[in-house]
């Protein structure tokens, strides 16, 4: 099954573009968060996905994305997990950690959303 494509959250604040998905259960791609403590960010991602019973939907998938600029002034890490409930639709829940240099860590929920293929 090929899960490559661009998936946009129902609130349009998160975009996952999956490329190079393969039968070994991994994929590459990009992830955009329209809001972070540092404004909109684009992350490179490597994710994983797993079939249950057979090679069709539903399937489990997840990814972690982080950004840490040169000089390491902060790190933002988002993690998402969920299912491809049917072809073209992801049901995902996400969390974030944000750690600024010399600051206090902030942990937050990103929410639970349907993501639709565009």
PLM regions: where:
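Central antiparallel beta-sheet cores of small beta-barrel/beta-sandwich binding domains
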Residues: 1-81, 93, 97-118
């Amino acid at each position: 099954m090929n899960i490559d494509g661009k998936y946009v959250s129902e609130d349009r604040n998160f975009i996952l573009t999956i490329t190079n998905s393969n039968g070994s259960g991994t994929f590459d791609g990009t992830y955009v968060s329209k809001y972070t403590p540092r404004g909109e960010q684009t992350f490179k991602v490597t994710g994983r996905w797993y079939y249950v019973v057979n090679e069709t939907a539903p399937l489990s998938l997840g990814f972690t994305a982080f950004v840490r600029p040169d000089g390491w002034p902060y790190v933002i890490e988002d993690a998402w997990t969920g299912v491809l409930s049917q072809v073209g639709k992801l049901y995902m829940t996400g969390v974030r950690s944000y750690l600024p240099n010399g600051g206090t860590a902030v942990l937050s929920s990103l929410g639970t959303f349907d993501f639709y293929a565009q």
